Amino acid sequence: MMGAPIPSAAPVGAATPGKGLLLSIVVPVFNEAEVLDLFLARLEPALEKARAALGPGGRSEIVFVDDGSVDGTAERIAGLIRPGAGVRLVKLSRNFGKDAALAAGLAHASGDAVVPMDADLQDPPELLERMVAAWRDG
């Protein structure tokens, strides 16, 4: 029906009972092994601030989607995965393109809010805190 309001899955700021809000960063990657260290060096402090902006118990996860890399990108990311690290890897069987990789990442993200981000730093991680604050403000 046209003009009918679209129901929201959950109001902004609604956390899982007993846990704080979860921010998912979805990062499609293709042959990004050379930039991963720089990306993570900038992302980690930005995520710390973004988690604080989420409010008490704010949490984050990074969902990398390897789009058929042949330069060791997936192996490098796999080395970051450990219990409690908040890093996940979705590995596509071949290069399907950025749109497909992003869609796969969105499907695997668990966050109350999801931010797509490129590993080549086209999207400055330092903006995450402001983005989260704007989202929280509605």
List PLM regions with ranges:
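Structured catalytic core of nucleotide-sugar glycosyltransferases
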Residues: 2-138
